[in-house]
Amino acid sequence: VAVVRCNGTCANRPRVNQYDGAKSCAIAASLYGGETGCSFGCLGCGDCVTACQFDAIHMNPETGLPEVDESKCTACGACAKACPRNIIEIRPQGKKSRRVYVQCVNKDKGAVARKACTVACIGCGKCVKVCPFEAITLENNLAYIDPNKCKSCRKCEEVCPQGTIIALNFPPRKPKTEGEAPKAEA
């Protein structure tokens, strides 16, 4: 299924440019780099929506990001090919459609990434250290979770200081019971 690897909603990314021409991600990427300070994130013009023949992806007007309707997605890859920033990735659905992934593609160093987007991966490496299955690598200041190695333990999600690691289609976590010892920091 297609996953959108950007969580830079309108609230998370400061606007730095405004363009009143044709709304196209391809045009935005080639002419002016988009309206936000993140040079890696979603451009928000919807080329992915136009490319989808199955009506499986739509732009959320509140967040400015595309959302995938998993019940309609055939994982054909048309949306991924249409994205000039390569933020859409085709991933296996996993057990009960559960997935854990890094919802960011920003390769800037921590402080620069955080300035461009408040929920960007800062490359701290906490997720790499806590993963018991060696499913996470850190390359070019960005964490990546290998879907073939990930066992969905979600320890990485717990330690991510930016909230960039997303776990989809899992039941809610059980609340901690009173007197339960806090988990050690990684």
What are the residue ranges of the model-derived segments?
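Ferredoxin-type iron-sulfur electron-transfer modules and their immediate structural context
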Residues: V1-C124, V128-V130, V159, G163-A186
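Strongly charged, low-complexity linkers/loops
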Residues: K126, P132-Y144
